[in-house]
Structure formats: structure tokens, C-alpha cells
Design a protein with these regions (language model features):
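Acetyl-CoA-dependent GNAT
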Residues: 3, 7-72, 78, 141
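Residues at alpha-helix boundaries and the short loops/turns that link adjacent helices
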Residues: 22-26, 89, 132
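Conserved active-site alpha-helix within GNAT-family acetyltransferase domains
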Residues: 93, 105, 117-135, 140
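Conserved GNAT acetyl-CoA-binding A-motif
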Residues: 96, 103-115
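Alpha-helical interaction/dimerization surfaces of two-component signaling modules
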Residues: 19-23, 102, 125, 129
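Conserved acetyl-CoA-binding loop-helix of GNAT-fold acetyltransferases
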Residues: 82, 88-101, 128
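Residue-level recognition of the GNAT/N-acetyltransferase active site
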Residues: 65, 83, 87, 116
Length: 142
């Protein structure tokens, strides 16, 4: 499968919404362009897609952040998903590689990804890419 990784466009909204739904985050396609624009305006965030034969088969978002505890920036993959029909073909690895390249280019010294406890297959994938389980995360909905 020949795959191109490129920046997400507003015209990718339907495909991105569908992929987010596969990940367990039902999304209205009409919201995607608005969210992409907000992310572009804020800066430090990139959403890209994997395209094969004119079809979007994966997407990922990475953000860069600076904290008081470190001089160097760190990156965080906030979304990565490949269509069920296109998994195990190197697309997820290509998306993660693009996130790593972006983070290196802007001076990050680390990249993290958060994954729900029940996504064991995803955890194995991240370990194969060289990621290590590091800490627990706590969230309070506001």
C-alpha cells in the first residue's frame, strides 16, 4: 500500500470524523474544519492524515508544550488512529514517525502518547516503536 502523510485539510473532515468515531470519539464532521482552524491559530499543534489511493486511512495530532519543569519543549500525540481496514500495514508507524520529525524540528527532547487502559494492542504498538510506560494520568471533567 502506497501511503502519503500530509497536513490535514478541511476537505478531510468526513474521513477524520469517521476515524475519530472508530477510536471511540463520535465527531460531527462539520466540527472538524472549525477545530483545525482553531489549532492552526493557536499554533504548536499539527494534524496530519495518511492517504492511500485518494482515501484518508489514518490521522494523528501532535502538540508541543513548554513547562516550568524543563528547558526543552516536549511533544504529545493527542490522537492517532488508522482505519480498521488499513491496520498492520505500517501506516500507524508512518504517522508516529511524522510526529517525531515535527517534534525534533521544533526542539522537543521527548514525545509522549496517552492511550486508554483497554487499548492493549495500541500499547504493544507503542512499545515496538520504542516508547516506555512512564506514569499514570488523572483527569477531572469540568
Amino acid at each position: 500500500m502506497d501511503v502519503t502523510i500530509r497536513e490535514a485539510r478541511d476537505s478531510d473532515a468526513e474521513a477524520i470524523a469517521s476515524l475519530l468515531g472508530e477510536l471511540g470519539y463520535p465527531t460531527d464532521a462539520a466540527a472538524v474544519p472549525r477545530r483545525l482552524e482553531r489549532m492552526r491559530a493557536e499554533g504548536g499543534q499539527w494534524t496530519f492524515v495518511a492517504e492511500s489511493d485518494g482515501q484518508v486511512v489514518g490521522t494523528a495530532t501532535v502538540m508541543v508544550r513548554h513547562t516550568i519543569s524543563r528547558d526543552a519543549a516536549s511533544g504529545r500525540v493527542t490522537t492517532v488512529v488508522v482505519s480498521e481496514t488499513a491496520r498492520s500495514q505500517g501506516i500507524g508507524s508512518a504517522l508516529m514517525e511524522r510526529a517525531e520529525v515535527i517534534c525534533r524540528e521544533v526542539g522537543c527532547t521527548a514525545l509522549e502518547v496517552t492511550s486508554a487502559e483497554h487499548r492493549r494492542r495500541a500499547h504493544d504498538f507503542y512499545v515496538r516503536l520504542g516508547y516506555e510506560e512512564h506514569r499514570k494520568r488523572f483527569i477531572k471533567l469540568l
